[in-house]
Structure formats: C-alpha cells, structure tokens
C-alpha cells in the first residue's frame, strides 16, 4: 500500500516547523530523536466517537502523553507495525507507560465499525483507544493534521485499500503537539522521546 502518500509535502512542512523551533531552542531543551514540531499550527483539538460510542476530544487526555495515529484495520503493514512499536514502547516505560494514551483514528470508517475497531486496537494493548467518525468528520480531522487519505477501489465495494500518511503525532501532558515520529523509527525512539516528555512535564 502506498501509505506514504503525500509525505514529501508533509516532510517539508515539518522540516520548516522544526527549523523554526530550532531557532528558538532553549540550550537545556530535551534532545528528541524524532522531529520536534513544538509550536506547529496543526493537529489542534478535535472530537470523534470512541469504539464504545462515547464522544472523545483530544483535550480529554491532558495529563497524559497522547499519541495520535491514523490507520485502518485492513492495513497490511504500516498500521500493525506502528501499533506494535507503541505497545513495546509502553512496556519499556514501565510504570510510566500508564501515563501514555494511544489514539488510533480510523481512516476507513465504512469498514471499521466500532466492534471491529475495538477488537483490532485492543489486541495490541487493552488501553489503546480507537476513534471513528463519519467519512466527512474523518476528512475534516485528517485535514487538520495535514494527513492525506485516499481510498483506492478494489474488486468490489468491500475490497479496497486506503492510502494514508504514516507518521505519528505526540502531545505532551499539557496538550501541546510536540513531536512527529516518521514511520519505522522503532519502539526505542517512541520510548525515549515519550520518557523525555513525561520527565519535562
């Protein structure tokens, strides 16, 4: 699947944001292994329903490090890899792993029903939360994150793939977007950078 659709544009935007952050960097600021996007003007608060049908806002998770990832349950590679890395990172954090909340936003609300989404996401970690909206709501939230989602028709209406941007967004406990983690960075990068956010909060 072409899950890196549009990543060249996003990479440019993130590089610009990182450069601006670097110009104002405190010499004592944490040295992250992923991209520091502190001060970025995207990825603001949103509301979607969780897999139990309860409305959730990003701001509901202040006090924890919130980790936002867009994907879908039929994803063959990027999504299970990223969720596995996050589950491993949380284990590496030990007791501090309880202060991390992973939010998986489905890019395929047509097939990812609440039941399907819950079964999939909690298989990686029972504390992970899956979020879904209508196709229109999903498109709106994706746009707010500069995430590109494209449905590719298959052999029938239920057999298709979804291209989606593959990075992960990490918020500090105060609710500020701080990091963009590119696909394939690995569990150790997640664990290292999340630990720094928890320590500095």
Q: What residues fall within each predicted segment?
A:
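Short active-site neighborhood of thiol/selenol oxidoreductases, capturing the structured segment around
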Residues: 59-82, 86
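N-terminal targeting signals for export/organelle localization
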Residues: 1-49, 197-201
């Amino acid at each position: 699947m072409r899950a890196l659709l549009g990543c060249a544009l996003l990479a440019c935007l993130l590089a610009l944001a990182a450069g601006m952050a670097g110009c104002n960097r405190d010499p004592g600021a944490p040295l992250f292994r992923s991209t520091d996007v502190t001060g970025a003007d995207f990825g603001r608060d949103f509301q979607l329903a969780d897999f139990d049908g309860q409305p959730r806002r990003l701001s509901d998770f202040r006090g924890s490090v919130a980790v936002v990832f867009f994907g879908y349950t039929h994803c063959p590679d990027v999504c299970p890899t990223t969720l596995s890395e996050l589950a491993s990172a949380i284990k590496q954090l030990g007791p501090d792993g309880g202060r991390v909340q992973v939010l998986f936003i489905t890019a395929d609300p047509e097939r990812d029903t609440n039941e399907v989404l819950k079964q999939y996401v909690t298989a990686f970690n029972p504390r992970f939360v899956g979020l879904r909206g209508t196709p229109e709501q999903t498109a709106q939230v994706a746009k707010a994150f500069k995430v590109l989602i494209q449905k590719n028709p298959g052999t029938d209406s239920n057999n298709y793939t979804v291209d989606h941007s593959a990075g992960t967004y990490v918020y500090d406990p105060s609710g500020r977007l701080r990091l963009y983690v590119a696909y394939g960075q690995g569990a150790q990068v997640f664990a290292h950078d999340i630990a720094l956010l928890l320590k500095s909060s």
